[in-house]
Amino acid sequence: MTAHIRPDLASIPAYVPGRNFPGAIKLASNETTVGPLPGVRDAVADAVANANRYPDNAAVALIEALASFLKVEPANVAAGCGSVTLCQELVQITCDQGDEVIYAWRSFEAYPVVTQVGHAVSVKVPLTEDFGHDLDAMLAAITDRTRLIFVCNPNNPTGNALSKAELESFLDAVPAHVVVALDEAYFEYSRSDADGIELFRSRPNVVVLRTFSKAYGLAGIRVGYAVADPEIIVALGKVHTPFTVSAVAQAAAIASLAAADELLARTEGVIAERTRVRTALIEAGYTVPESSANFVYLPLGELSPAFAEASTEAGILIRQYGVEGVRMTIGDPHENDAFLAFADTDVAKQAAGIGVSA
């Protein structure tokens, strides 16, 4: 093949989705188990009837619905094919070659990918000892080449959530020309007092990213959104790939916004299960940081590969993060029970380095 391919692509870490195989209990991808919210199926069916037509590239109806729901102006909202595409677009609109993007590590796996694809340089700031954002270190990492900071709150994969006071102090210390993206993919599962929309209102350099993939149950349809200053929204529109937010996605998202009561009931159920699972794991001898998302994190270090492999052999798929830890999605109660039963076995505890009886 004679085509010229960017040489640096060889060093880009490919995004690795959660695995799946027939018959397995899949607790690897932070998906909801209950499907779309009420009204979504009918909205999708109506949209499919016009699948021969291009979607509204401006997503006017969706943006107006989001603006009303969030109590912002339509000029403050952009739609995307999941919030990850908006992450990519933020790098594109803020960074020239060699500019820097700061984020905690470990955090969302897509950050290093979108940064390098955008010809920018990743500045990874290690998490604190309790697996949260080290905001002071992130501030200290800012240079004259810093253009963008990602703050995943709650953090994926560790689950920690920052408070309103912590974020206010951090945001007010960031130079006004540096864009801060508050990635709130798991916002609906958090009961922290931090709300990115409220933090954005008085800070034009703050962008809030949210998605319909998690709590709203639309992971397979792909739709997310950004809330930001109109100048940023206009710039996002200039790099947006046309028609990537399908008519089906737009219709499903609009219908989802009308089911707030059901969404709250579902997220409360997940939170109750999250608490139950974390408590049981701690009682079994595991270290489990407090989580504000729909998953729990086990910081097993170098034992992570062995534990993940043992879990797979038991028919339960979880997410391994190198030699740092593993993440377990909160599923249905019977799925969670299966994982807890595995985690309490001698095989699992030996893999995790937890003492077991002879």
Swiss-Prot record:
Superkingdom as given in the UniProt entry: Bacteria
EC primary class: transferase
InterPro entries noted in UniProt: Aminotrans_II_pyridoxalP_BS, Aminotransferase_I/II_large, ArAT, HisP_aminotrans, HistidinolP_aminotransfase, PyrdxlP-dep_Trfase, PyrdxlP-dep_Trfase_major, PyrdxlP-dep_Trfase_small
GO MF annotations, alphabetized? aromatic-amino-acid transaminase activity; histidinol-phosphate transaminase activity; pyridoxal phosphate binding
Q: Name one GO biological process term.
A: L-histidine biosynthetic process
- Which of UniProt's keywords are assigned here? Aminotransferase, Pyridoxal phosphate, Transferase
Q: What's the EC number here?
A: 2.6.1.57
Q: Please list the cofactors this protein needs.
A: pyridoxal 5'-phosphate
- Give the reaction(s) catalysed: an aromatic L-alpha-amino acid + 2-oxoglutarate = an aromatic oxo-acid + L-glutamate
One Pfam family per UniProt: Aminotran_1_2
Per the record, residues carrying N6-(pyridoxal phosphate)lysine are K214
Function per UniProt: Aminotransferase that catalyzes the conversion of aromatic amino acids and 2-oxoglutarate into corresponding aromatic oxo acids and L-glutamate.
Family to which this protein belongs = Belongs to the class-II pyridoxal-phosphate-dependent aminotransferase family.
SUBUNIT field = Homodimer.
- Name under which the protein is recorded: Aromatic amino acid aminotransferase
